[in-house]
Curated annotation (Swiss-Prot):
Residues 1-18 form the signal peptide. Keywords: Fertilization, Signal. Transmembrane segments: none annotated. One of its GO terms (cellular component) is acrosomal lumen. This is Egg-lysin. One of its GO terms (biological process) is single fertilization. InterPro entries: Egg_lysin, Egg_lysin_sf. It comes from the Eukaryota. Homodimer. It comes from Haliotis walallensis. Pfam families: Egg_lysin. The keyword Oxidoreductase does not apply. Dissolves the egg vitelline layer nonenzymatically during fertilization. It creates a hole of about 3 mu-m in diameter through which the sperm pass. Sperm.
Length: 154
């Protein structure tokens, strides 16, 4: 029982720290900048997935492969606020007004640096690839630039 309580407190402290001590107000980003980020992040994730499928995807069905493409898009949507914190820090460090090429470069860096191979191996190894549903098809059919995101800040 003591161990359970200790684990719960540790989890609460971890969540509190991941949300920061103070509220960071979200900064709205120009649509062109947002599109540049999304396109490059998804391109990087999809490039990683194609390489991974060549090496490990022989046993996966076509539907499971499509579900992994959805995982890429959902991962980007889920972590968008964290990406924006990092992007805002990098843009502020430039010391000049940002242009689309800056956001394109940062989006490509995010897509390249995040180790999605780990997630694909985790999902495949534990047979946790999600069942492909109609809403997944809708998001997969969208262009990278049109994938909806919500930035509420952290």
């Amino acid at each position: 029982m003591k161990l359970l309580v200790l684990c719960i407190f540790a989890m609460m402290a971890t969540l509190a720290m991941s949300r920061r001590w103070n509220f960071v107000t979200p900064r709205e980003v120009n649509k062109a900048f947002e599109v540049a980020l999304k396109v490059q992040i998804i391109a990087g994730f999809d490039r990683t997935l194609v390489k991974w499928l060549r090496a490990h995807g022989r046993s996966l069905s076509h539907v499971q492969k499509k579900a992994l493409y959805f995982v890429n898009r959902r991962y980007m949507q889920t972590h968008w606020a964290n990406y924006m914190l990092w992007v805002n820090k990098k843009i502020d460090a430039l010391g000049r007004t940002a242009v689309v090429a800056d956001y394109t470069r940062l989006g490509a860096e995010i897509g390249r640096r995040i180790d999605m191979d780990y997630f694909y191996n985790f999902l495949k190894g534990r047979n946790m690839i999600p069942k492909y549903l109609p809403y997944m098809e809708e998001i997969n059919r969208m262009r990278s630039a049109d994938i909806p995101i919500r930035y509420r800040g952290k």
